[in-house]
């Protein structure tokens, strides 16, 4: 490892500069890494802690290549879906190193690629699904899958463009929202049948130089396609946990590379279904900032740098609750911090996002408790204490 801002520096470039990337940037800088952050807008969270930043349309392959060739990073770390991933494949072929790999990024940032890999190549259990690229194909897919179902753009995250279709009256609206709400604009959708599950988990799965390490399962509650709260550890029976690890291992081993993967799974009794996977820290994993001795961000930093990842120690029942205001402002301010942090074992992260347009995740409350329910209650109370001023 060299010295930041010197000729011998080890440089990491982040494609995307959100709150998850911000935490990884901080962890990398603990190891003396020089970090460059890029995104489509200025002053994004990770930009605020990086050594330097660039505003780039990451869906433009020419613009993306230009900034990468200018910076010549040792590692390229994609943080969001809206990236010209075929260009990353070309850059990797030219000698750049993409985390965890350009193939993994290309597959996982497109729901069609990863679902076909999991269900059709690896033979893993999933919900029933169809893909559609036109309105006519969509209507046919809805008829084949049957109601109720979920419609998602193949390129989106955090619930953007996602709808639940329970009645025929919802069908047309879901198609239109998928075409306008996805991060990459109009395009193909996945029509996904409901799975009758007891709960859903994120299994953080780390692929590093010494093998694969699993964190304790994270339970979470979704609303409108985005997570509202998460907790760790999620209680599971032994067989369900074993099957979850087998599914996660199969996916992560196939995708390869080093780093942390957030593997999303549905669980009912002893049965487990694969849902999705992200090749980077997961938003539900924000809870690991208090629940583990090494957060998912610290683990990711170690793994991508080729540093061994030891057994991760759990700190006890922990929870996170999202701060999710709705409004419009370019000068957001917050009150209620003293009240939010009054309880022992409670922490807060305000992400520093430069503007609020509509509904946006602006922070998260974190709590340790005597039980999962105690931790969840403390986190929810802390989150609700924060008042967002527009």
UniProtKB/Swiss-Prot annotation:
InterPro entries, per database record: ATP-grasp, ATP-grasp_carboxylate-amine, ATP_grasp_subdomain_1, PreATP-grasp_dom_sf, PurT, PurT/PurK_preATP-grasp, PurT_C
Question: Looking at the keywords, is Metal-binding present?
Answer: yes
Reading the lineage from the top rank, the first entry is: Bacteria
Q: Which family is it part of?
A: Belongs to the PurK/PurT family.
| Keywords from the named record | ATP-binding, Ligase, Magnesium, Metal-binding, Nucleotide-binding, Purine biosynthesis
Q: What does this protein do?
A: Involved in the de novo purine biosynthesis. Catalyzes the transfer of formate to 5-phospho-ribosyl-glycinamide (GAR), producing 5-phospho-ribosyl-N-formylglycinamide (FGAR). Formate is provided by PurU via hydrolysis of 10-formyl-tetrahydrofolate.
Q: How does it assemble?
A: Homodimer.
**Which residues participate in N(1)-(5-phospho-beta-D-ribosyl)glycinamide binding?**
19-20, 79, 283, 353, 360-361
Which GO BP terms, alphabetically? Answer: 'de novo' IMP biosynthetic process
Under which name does UniProt file this protein? Formate-dependent phosphoribosylglycinamide formyltransferase
Name a GO CC annotation attached to this entry.
cytosol
Q: Which molecular function terms from Gene Ontology are attached? A: ATP binding; magnesium ion binding; phosphoribosylglycinamide formyltransferase 2 activity; phosphoribosylglycinamide formyltransferase activity
Q: Which organism is it from?
A: Marinobacter nauticus (strain ATCC 700491 / DSM 11845 / VT8)
């Amino acid at each position: 490892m060299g010295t930041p801002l010197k000729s011998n520096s080890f440089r990491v470039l982040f494609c995307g500069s959100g709150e998850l990337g911000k935490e990884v940037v901080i962890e990398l800088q603990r190891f003396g890494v020089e970090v460059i952050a890029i995104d489509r807008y200025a002053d994004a969270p990770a930009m605020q802690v990086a050594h330097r930043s660039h505003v780039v349309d990451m869906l433009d392959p020419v613009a993306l290549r230009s900034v990468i060739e200018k910076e010549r990073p040792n590692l390229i770390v994609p943080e969001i879906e809206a990236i010209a991933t075929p260009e990353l494949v070309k850059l990797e072929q030219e000698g750049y190193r993409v985390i965890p790999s350009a193939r993994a990024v290309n597959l996982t940032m497109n729901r069609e690629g990863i679902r076909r890999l999991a269900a059709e190549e690896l033979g893993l259990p999933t919900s029933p699904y169809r893909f559609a690229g036109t309105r006519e194909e969509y209507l046919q897919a809805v008829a084949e899958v049957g109601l109720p179902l979920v419609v998602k753009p193949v390129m989106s995250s955090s619930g953007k463009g996602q709808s639940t279709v329970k009645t025929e009256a919802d069908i047309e609206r879901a198609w239109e929202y998928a075409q306008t709400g996805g991060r990459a604009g109009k395009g193909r959708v996945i029509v996904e049948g409901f799975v009758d599950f007891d709960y859903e988990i994120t299994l953080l799965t780390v692929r590093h130089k010494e093998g694969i390490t699993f964190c304790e399962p994270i339970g979470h509650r979704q609303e409108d396609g985005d997570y509202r709260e998460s907790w760790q550890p999620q209680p599971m029976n032994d067989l369900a946990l074993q099957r979850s690890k087998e599914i996660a291992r199969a996916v992560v081993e196939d995708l390869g590379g080093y780093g942390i993967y957030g593997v999303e799974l549905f669980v009912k009794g002893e049965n487990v279904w694969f849902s999705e996977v992200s090749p980077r820290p997961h938003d539900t994993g924000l809870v690991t900032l208090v629940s583990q001795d090494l957060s998912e961000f610290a683990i990711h930093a170690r793994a991508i740098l080729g540093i061994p990842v030891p057994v991760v120690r759990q700190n006890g029942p922990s929870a996170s609750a999202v701060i999710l205001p709705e409004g419009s402002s370019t000068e957001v301010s917050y009150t209620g911090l003293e009240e939010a942090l009054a309880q022992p074992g409670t922490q807060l992260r305000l992400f520093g996002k430069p503007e609020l347009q509509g509904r946006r995740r602006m922070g998260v409350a974190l709590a340790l408790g005597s039980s999962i329910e105690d931790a969840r209650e403390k986190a929810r109370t802390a989150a609700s204490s924060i008042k967002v001023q527009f």
